[in-house]
């Protein structure tokens, strides 16, 4: 009985709507004629005919409500944004081109391979020294050599890299012509490798530039025999940090963290071991304006100049607050910088009596890290000037580095002035 009544009522409503539409001087909104005015011109887009039947109005309102509900759908807790997907979105927005997307993907692949090697170093007998010395005069660890090969091979196979410059190479290396591309990539394949044997945090650092000129140096060339053209090529590879298109680092620790900037904010991705993909975990990272943490190797204190000693002594003084700065030092630039980026404070590797120009390399350590910290709202300085403004004169040029929260770096600069 109730079903019959419902059917009758429904039929009655439909019949009433039909009669209303038929008697109206205006066409129904469901009719194609409703898209045009009386003189045959098309009505403006988005304008509705409000003189339609009440039954049609109910249908439209229901449709609008359904659309709103769909738009307000909550993001699934299982929805992951991978580094590859994120890069493709940046490409679609015009932030980067397809070439740079491929280069970045190649770098992320190299980082995954190195992460695996680091995690299995003790098992695979990859600890200890290689028995060779690099251009810096440093004993090469086994993983230094292997990581450099991994990075170089991934960049060569991308087909989008023209020149690569590494901490472990004497000179910039031109990628074979059949595989060469447009980008210059500088990198430290394994920063903090002295920590490998103790399973302490290490990392890889990279920066990407557009080329100023074509490099013709081959990896078989003897640097002492280079002519004027080759030397000019090296100078052209040495670009200031202001020219960086992208920079980042990958930290190999309790988790594998890939931090990246394309010049518009800093983003962090964590390697998911289940899927083997870097997953977006932090967006638009901002370093605190100040932080009561300093990260210096105080073993070199006696070799520092008096101004820097005074600065460090004052940090240790409790002062009116009764709370001195906390000292934190890992011995890995990537590890110490990552903590500073998240918690605030200052990291420093100054010049001293032994290292007149400091120890860190400008092109592939100081400049990329300074680019990242500035994108996060911090500051990178050599104690007197902005790191990104320094024009390198050689591939392995060293400079002092003070990097971190803006207020902390500016405070140090006043001491050193």
UniProtKB/Swiss-Prot annotation:
Q: Where does the chain bind Mg(2+) 3? A: 188, 191, 365
Question: Quick one: which residues bind Mg(2+) 1?
Answer: 138, 167
User: Where N-acetylalanine occurs along the chain?
Assistant: 60
InterPro entries (alphabetical): FBPase_C_dom, FBPase_class-1, FBPase_N, FBPtase, Fructose_bisphosphatase_AS
CDD domains for this protein:
FBPase
Sites where the protein binds Mg(2+) 2: 167, 188, 190
Name the GO cellular-component terms: apoplast; chloroplast; chloroplast stroma; cytosol; stromule
Disulfides per UniProt:
233-238
Q: Does the keyword Plastid apply?
A: yes
Q: One of this protein's GO BP terms?
A: photosynthetic electron transport in photosystem I
Give this protein's Gene Ontology molecular function annotations.
fructose 1,6-bisphosphate 1-phosphatase activity; metal ion binding
Q: How does it assemble?
A: Homotetramer.
Matching entries from PANTHER family are given as:
FRUCTOSE-1,6-BISPHOSPHATASE-RELATED (PTHR11556), FRUCTOSE-BISPHOSPHATASE (PTHR11556:SF1)
Name of protein: Fructose-1,6-bisphosphatase 1, chloroplastic
Tell me the organism.
Arabidopsis thaliana
